[in-house]
Design a protein with these regions (language model features):
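DPxDG-like acidic metal-binding loop motif
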Residues: 155-188
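Glycine-rich beta->alpha junctions and the first turn(s) of the following alpha-helix
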Residues: 198-284
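Acidic-glycine-rich active-site phosphate/pyrophosphate-binding loop
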Residues: 65-69, 145, 220-228, 331
């Protein structure tokens, strides 16, 4: 644990909430990790316990003074133990972020409080839309305006932290190129959840393909009829919240390295630039940078957005590097399926490939820089 994080954990409110989250994580999550990793458990009860502890509610009331640091720190507590569950925590926190920022008061009243407390679970279906905005994919959902709402058809290959009684947010495109962001009720008979092929580390995350069979989306389920201004408002939060997945996994990787010191320190010392103190320095710098950015998630300047994208890229690369170093420090022990080092390595790769992935982040930075020099 970094000194800065330990000091926050020991602090006063609102970090009393963080201590409550840590208590839930430490008492309940370790026993679930193996099943989550194998895909035999979707931890719905644990996610609801996180919500009851306040993990999803610190950013539920949108205002100019809102910051995302408590949500990020709560997620990092989860990530110290299980990267898959931290990803689900991000999905849930992001759903709350959407609902907190919509101007659709009926939708907010229907779902926000329940999502913020964990009573209602759900996720985000923005992987395809986020890629489409940067020319990587085409929009997979198509909608047309009808009386009282829209009819949507198409399919999303992966949406996480969902199930038959869950909801999630996503975007469709109309024939005129306009885009609308909305909330999907997975219990709709015209919405079909499809099982995915096995993943490397995320099979317990409630991840499904989602088929829209001319599903009717009423106006009271619309987050924003004009999606792009809304996306610009929530984009920094969407990306910054993912830092929680990175921070906790890095801390745990550092802890693994330190624990190997007694038995393997005499040889591990030759792992140049891959020592615990190297990653402590990286983590502290990254933590400081993310904390500063997370205090102003509604900033829309290009300079701020570039800094957010850069921080997310650095967080993912640091996570993969730290987990890789932890594997090297554990040696053959970490190569056993029973050792957590190999699981943490698999989870770290996910931080590098979840949208926005490392390659997309690099493209985004290149695009921003090209526009700035034009």
């Amino acid at each position: 644990m970094s000194l800065a994080f330990a000091q926050r954990l020991a602090g006063n409110a609102p970090y009393e909430t963080l201590a409550d989250v840590r208590a839930v994580v430490q008492s309940q999550l370790p026993a679930l990790v193996e099943g989550i990793d194998k895909g035999t458990i979707y931890p719905a009860d644990f996610m609801r316990a996180l919500g009851a502890a306040g993990a999803f509610s610190s950013h539920a009331e949108a205002n100019e003074d809102l910051d995302l640091n408590l949500a990020i720190d709560a997620m990092s507590e989860v990530s110290e133990v299980c990267g898959a569950t931290a990803f689900m925590t991000w999905c849930q926190s992001t759903l709350v972020w959407y609902l907190a920022n919509t101007e659709n008061e009926a939708l907010k009243a229907k779902y926000l409080a329940r999502a913020a407390t964990g009573e209602l679970l759900g996720g985000t279906g923005l992987s395809n839309p986020m890629k489409s905005f940067f020319g990587i994919e085409k929009m997979k959902l198509k909608g047309k305006r009808v009386d009282g709402g829209y009819v949507v058809r198409g399919a999303l290959p992966w949406v996480s932290n969902i199930g038959p009684d869950h909801v999630f947010g996503t975007i469709f495109e109309c024939a005129d190129g306009g885009k609308t962001m909305f909330v999907v009720d997975c219990s709709d008979p015209n919405i079909e959840l499809l099982d995915c092929d096995p993943f490397l580390a995320m099979d317990g995350t409630g991840t499904y393909g989602v088929q829209f069979k001319d599903a009717f989306i009423p106006d009271d389920m619309v987050l924003a009829h004009a999606a792009m201004p809304f996306v610009k408002k929530i984009r920094a939060g969407f990306v910054l919240l993912q830092a929680g997945m990175a921070m906790g996994l890095i801390r745990d990787s550092i802890d693994t390295m330190r624990k190997m010191g007694a038995s393997l320190g005499h040889v591990n010392k030759y792992l140049t630039a891959q020592q615990p103190e190297d990653f402590e320095a990286i983590l502290d710098e990254l933590d400081t940078r993310v904390r500063d950015l997370a205090t102003t998630p509604y900033e829309t300047s290009e300079a701020y957005w570039r800094a957010v994208v850069q921080a997310r890229l650095d967080a993912g690369e640091a996570t993969m590097a730290a987990a890789h170093a932890a594997m090297l420090h554990t040696g053959a022990r970490g190569y056993h399926k029973s050792h957590k080092a190999q699981r943490r390595m698999r989870e770290a790769y996910f931080v590098g490939i979840v949208t926005p992935a490392t390659k997309q982040l690099r493209k985004m930075l290149a695009d921003i820089d090209a526009e700035g020099s034009a």
